[in-house]
């Protein structure tokens, strides 16, 4: 905090450096001096009339950050839009190409039909036997059906479309770039082989130039040793050797520079080839990882679809199918038993007309058999429930009061009778489930399948 007294000494003003604001502790009139001068330690001039130096909130940093974020977002949106346009153009190109291939197939089919109907192309007379030539390809094509010929042309166009679709898939997955990299590697290998051959050639020429110059220098040295006994031919030879030595030196220097240039070029090609091969294997590894990841997600999606279909079949279709089969079976059994009862009643009426009442009672018993057959499943469930609850029964018997030994004996006998009446099922007997038990069994089976597939 800095304290400064304004126009009147009795009005102290408190200046906060952290908030960069002026706050009057007690005032009767506003303060007209600049906070900037107070921040820099300058004393304001009391006679100054500048009232526009009050510091406003600075939003430059905020605006700069917003502009940076907006520029980054705008760049991302432009890249996304350009990528979308590229894929849209590729898709439209493939669709137009497929349309053109279909139109080309239709055009070929119409041309074939016009050729069949053209009289100039229907000459089929054999000059040796004056008979008709049979088995011509056009005649065979004429006997074929139109849809078969159209299908053949469509398959021909479809083959090209499949190749184009494969190329488009490679473009989407990025394998086209890897193929271009492979072709560039093969070209670089060819260039490297040519450069090596050229290097060997220039190196041999450089060695020959060195030998020629050394030989000419030896001849010059021999001539200089017998300079006192030179003849006119020796003088001409010396002059010629001197000129050739200069030419050989120039040629040797040129060949030396070429050999150095070829060596640097060969080293550069070797480095580029090495880097290209490393890049190729790296990109192929990335591509294979992407394809493997995509196949993994595809497998998960297919597994999810299979689980969904299994749940739908087991929880919706199978109960409906079972209910329908049971209902139709019960209806058939009822109708068969009713017909059998009617036939028996008619026979008994014919044999014993006086005992019709007994026959009607027998018919009622037959109808009760049908009802007992329908309620058989419910009894089985009750029996299984009684098997599962022996502890409850024993608990109830133990909680009751035992007044005498006779009462205890009667209760034990009743317990044995109850246990004897329980119908135990064999191991190979079919299981009987109600709807809730079947749903619980299906859900547990599906959860175990998901758990096992996740562990694998």
Curated annotation (Swiss-Prot):
Pfam families: She9_MDM33. InterPro entries: MDM33_fungi. GO terms for biological process: inner mitochondrial membrane organization; mitochondrion organization. One of its GO terms (cellular component) is mitochondrial inner membrane. It is found in: Mitochondrion inner membrane. Residues 31-296 are mitochondrial matrix. Residues 318-435 are mitochondrial intermembrane. The chain crosses the membrane at residues 297-317, 436-456. Required for the maintenance of the structure of the mitochondrial inner membrane. Involved in mitochondrial morphology. Causes growth arrest when highly overexpressed. It comes from the Eukaryota. The gene is SHE9. Keywords: Coiled coil, Membrane, Mitochondrion, Mitochondrion inner membrane, Transit peptide, Transmembrane, Transmembrane helix. This is Sensitive to high expression protein 9, mitochondrial. Homooligomer. Participates in a complex of about 300 kDa.
């Amino acid at each position: 905090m800095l304290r400064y007294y304004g126009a009147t000494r009795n009005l102290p003003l408190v200046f906060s450096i952290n908030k960069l604001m002026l706050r009057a502790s007690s005032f009767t009139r506003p303060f007209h001096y600049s906070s900037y001068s107070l921040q820099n330690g300058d004393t304001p001039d009391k006679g100054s009339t500048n009232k526009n130096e009050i510091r406003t909130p600075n939003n430059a940093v905020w605006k700069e950050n917003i502009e940076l974020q907006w520029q980054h977002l705008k760049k991302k949106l432009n890249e996304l839009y350009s990528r979308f346009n590229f894929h849209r153009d590729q898709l439209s190109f493939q669709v137009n190409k497929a349309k053109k291939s279909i139109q080309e197939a239709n055009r070929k089919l119409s041309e074939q039909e016009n050729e069949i109907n053209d009289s100039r192309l229907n000459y089929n007379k054999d000059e040796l036997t004056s008979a008709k030539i049979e088995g011509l390809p056009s005649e065979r094509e004429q006997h074929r059906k139109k849809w078969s010929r159209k299908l053949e042309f469509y398959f021909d166009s479809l083959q090209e479309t499949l190749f184009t679709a494969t190329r488009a898939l490679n473009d989407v997955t990025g394998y086209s770039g890897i193929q271009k990299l492979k072709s560039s590697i093969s070209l670089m290998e060819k260039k490297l082989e040519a450069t090596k051959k050229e290097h060997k050639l220039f190196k041999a020429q450089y060695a020959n130039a060195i030998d020629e110059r050394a030989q000419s220098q030896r001849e010059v040295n021999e001539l200089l040793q017998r300079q006192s006994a030179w003849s006119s031919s020796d003088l001409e030879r010396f002059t010629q050797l001197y000129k050739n030595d200069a030419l050989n030196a120039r040629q040797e220097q040129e060949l030396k520079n070429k050999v150095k240039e070829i060596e640097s070029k060969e080293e550069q090609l070797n480095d580029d080839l090495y880097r290209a091969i490393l890049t190729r294997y790296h990109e192929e590894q990335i591509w294979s990882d992407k394809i493997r990841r995509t196949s993994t997600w595809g497998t998960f999606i297919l597994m999810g679809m299979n689980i969904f279909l299994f749940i739908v079949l087991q929880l919706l279709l199978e109960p409906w199918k079972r209910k329908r089969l049971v209902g139709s079976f019960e209806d058939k059994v009822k109708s068969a038993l009713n017909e059998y009862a009617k036939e028996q009643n008619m026979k008994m009426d014919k044999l014993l007309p006086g005992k019709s009442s007994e026959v009607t009672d027998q018919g009622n018993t037959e109808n009760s058999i049908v009802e007992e057959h329908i309620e058989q499943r419910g009894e089985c469930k009750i029996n299984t429930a009684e098997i599962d609850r022996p502890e409850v029964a024993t608990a109830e018997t133990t909680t009751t009061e035992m007044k005498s030994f006779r009462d205890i004996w009667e209760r034990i006998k009743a317990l044995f009778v109850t246990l004897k009446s329980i119908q135990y099922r064999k191991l190979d007997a079919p299981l009987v489930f109600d709807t809730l038990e079947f749903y619980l069994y299906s859900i547990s089976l599906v959860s175990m399948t998901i758990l096992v597939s996740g562990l694998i």
